[in-house]
Structure formats: structure tokens, C-alpha cells
Amino acid sequence: MASRMGMVAILSLFVCALVASTSVNANVWQTDEDAFYSTNKLGVNGNMEMAQQQGGFIGHRPRLASFNRASKQLDREKRPVPSGPDPIHHSIPSHAPQHPPSYGKAPYEDDKSIASPGLSNLIGPPPFLDRY
């Protein structure tokens, strides 16, 4: 049974490797010119010089994370952050006030609203009864 499972695992890895080597996305592993240029005529936008300046790779490039955005600020101060909801993503009418409404007291600040007094007596260990 173990040898059969091992053979299935090896066969499945072989099939996955075969599919990956023949797929279009496997061009990363190839180093010949055919992997970088499908034709030797023109680049993506019809500009061969642009394709050569970019290192010759035509196709999907992964986006790299940029961590230097904050260091490029000239004034070295905090960036201004708008307050309130974004009117583009939230349907707020233009005549609505731009500040949040103020409430007198939140309902959870009252002790009676946390748990009703009838249930507070039931919480805890059961009372000791004389059974003997």
C-alpha cells in the first residue's frame, strides 16, 4: 500500500513538472532568446528599442513592493489624512453634515443594559442544598 502511494506521488509530481515546463508561464526558467522574444520584429507596443531597454523581457512582470514612499517626502512631516467618510465610496448626500452625529450616552455604558438583573442572580455556582 505504501509503495503504491509512493508511486502515485512520484507520478503526480512528474505530471506537474511536465505541465509546468510546457506552459507559457515557464518562460522564466528558460535562458535562450525564444523565451524573451516571440518574434524578432517588434516589442509589445511596436517599439523594439523600448523592449531592449527594459531588459528584453516581454510578458507579465511581477509588481515589486516599494518601501521608500515615506522617505521621498520633502518636508518629513506626517501626510495629511482626510477625516470622515469618503464621499466617493460612501453614498453621502452633499447636503449632509460632514461631522459624525453626537449621542448623549451610549447604551452599553449603563450597567443595567449589560445584563438584566434577573439573569445576574443565575450566574455563579448553584446553591448548596441540604440533601442528607
UniProtKB/Swiss-Prot annotation:
Name this polypeptide is given: CLAVATA3/ESR (CLE)-related protein 2-B
Keyword terms of this UniProt record: Developmental protein, Differentiation, Glycoprotein, Hydroxylation, Secreted, Signal
Family: Belongs to the CLV3/ESR signal peptide family.
This protein's GO CC annotations: apoplast
Disulfide bonds: none
Residue numbers bearing the Hydroxyproline modification: P82, P85
InterPro entries for the chain: CLV3/ESR
Domain of life: Eukaryota
GO biological process terms held by the UniProt record: cell-cell signaling involved in cell fate commitment
Transmembrane feature ranges: none
Organism: Zea mays (Maize)
GO molecular function per UniProt: receptor serine/threonine kinase binding
Signal peptide: 1-26
UniProt region (Disordered), positions on chain: 68-132
Glycosylation sites: P85
